[in-house]
Amino acid sequence: MVSGDFVTSDWHFAHPYVAALRYFQKVNMTANDLRTYCQTHGVYIGEYVDTETHDNIIMNRLNRLYTGGDNKIIVAGDISSGSTGSLDKALKFIEDRCAFPKDKRILVCGNHELMLTKKNFTKLYDVFGEVHTSPLQYSDNIVISHFPVKQRFESDDYWNEGNRRKKFIKYAPIKEDNKIYLYGHTHSMDWEEFGKGISEFNIGIDACRLTAAPIQYFVDLDKERKSENL
């Protein structure tokens, strides 16, 4: 089933704060400082962030991957901020601009989708051919989810500092032997943020340089890492 399918996560279209985290702000301030400034002064952060350029760059890179064949794109959650305004803009943007046809778009929900109202959640089906609210068993040995495996929520890894993400543990897959886990959520820029040779790969847009990656790449990388450990 791998063939030419692609995987990605955490697009965050129409989400100024995340665009600022990716250095698309128009002012010389960090994303967190900018957010604090806007909250303190009661101004909209979007006025200081080039969200449109952020979204267009990502979409342009994604569109280069579609060849008109049967290859699908699996999005492991967080297509927007989760607010109604952001969601509506993101869905329209995907519908209008994404080269992958609707039946080739698969969504595995992240926290920003799981928090949606029922009314807003149903909008996802207008743009995606499949919508999954739990980890996707992509093949016999590949699991795609928004969240890292449950064991990561129980560890002291940097991203889980203060256990602030514990509330999402119920959505995370349980790690099993001889399976590859592809996930997003952490916004790490490292595919192997939790270590090499453990069959866990971050496929978020930050790790993939603002585009998607072939699933086959991670299958091959997993084999390579295992051979290194022999």
Regions found by a protein language model. Give the residues of each.
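Core catalytic region of metal-dependent phosphoesterases/phosphodiesterases
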Residues: 2, 6-8, 13-138
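Conserved beta-sheet core of the metallophosphoesterase superfamily
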Residues: 123-230
